[in-house]
Amino acid sequence: MADEKSPTRISPHLIAASRSEMRNNMKFRPCIDIHNGKVKQVVGSSIKDEGNIAKENFVSEKGAEYYANLYKVRNLSGGHIILLNHKDSEYYEATKEQALLALNAYKGGMQIGGGINADNAREFLDAGASHVIVTSYVFSDSRLNYDNLERIYKAVGKERLVLDLSCRKKNDKYYIVTDRWQRFTDEIVNEEFMHKLAGYCDEFLIHAVDVEGKNNGIERELVKILGGFDEIPITYAGGVKSLEDIEILKKYSDGRLDFTIGSSLDLFGGRISFEEIADKY
């Protein structure tokens, strides 16, 4: 493993000042989750590579391109496309094909994650992704792998890299999980760790995996931790089931966090109006 190091970074004071101006201006970040070649909403903690299994909340009859076009028409940028199949899965190519169709439909409008590394990242950027989202590649062997972090940083640059710090709670702390949220690492999400990574990436994406897809409300403790961090934008995903949850998210994060809604959105069989969210946020 390489020595711990960090690229040249903008003054944290300037970044914090910029982020402070964004308070109370939370932004809705739409999503397209693709599993077994279909747009789906799944329970995050249920995903199993073996057998390509996941507990499904919603399976769309429409392709990923439909949703990308919808987000484009509503000028909703900065959303993410997630490939939920492992590269060795028999369904991976079908899932990837759907993702590429979505990127082509909304060039520069969406980020993409799922199996991204320094060798294939450029393919997805060239296909139209604004950013690549990376987790497992930089958290190999249960720890932060600085060699791989440097490789992806050099391959795409800070401005086009999103680090996914999706996490699950264990022993009262939030540990980053990898491999489609199946494997715990030894890295804990806290302000110190996020500060260490902020110089490498443009944003963080963080799914609260324990509540992802369960419609039980947001992970408030995690939101408090994330809301205390000012250096780069953070998108929170997991458990938003109502407009009230968005207000709670705003309160607990002081309006700093952007957010994603999945299975609770009427686009995906839920009750929250997509049109209302798109208009308001």
Where do the model's predicted regions map?
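Alpha-helix-loop-beta-strand connector modules within alpha/beta enzyme cores
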Residues: 90-111, 151-164, 218-235, 241
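Catalytic cores of alpha/beta
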Residues: 110-111, 116-128, 221-229, 235-236, ...
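Conserved anion-binding
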Residues: 46-47, 129-205, 211
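N-terminal active-site wall of soluble small-molecule enzyme domains
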Residues: 73, 77-109, 115-123
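Glycine-rich, proline-tolerant flexible connector loops at the mouths of alpha/beta enzymes
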Residues: 78-94, 136-142, 207-215
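Glycine-rich phosphate-binding active-site loops on the catalytic face of alpha/beta enzymes
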Residues: 127-145, 239-242, 254-273
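Conserved, mostly hydrophobic/aromatic
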Residues: 33, 124, 163, 204, ...
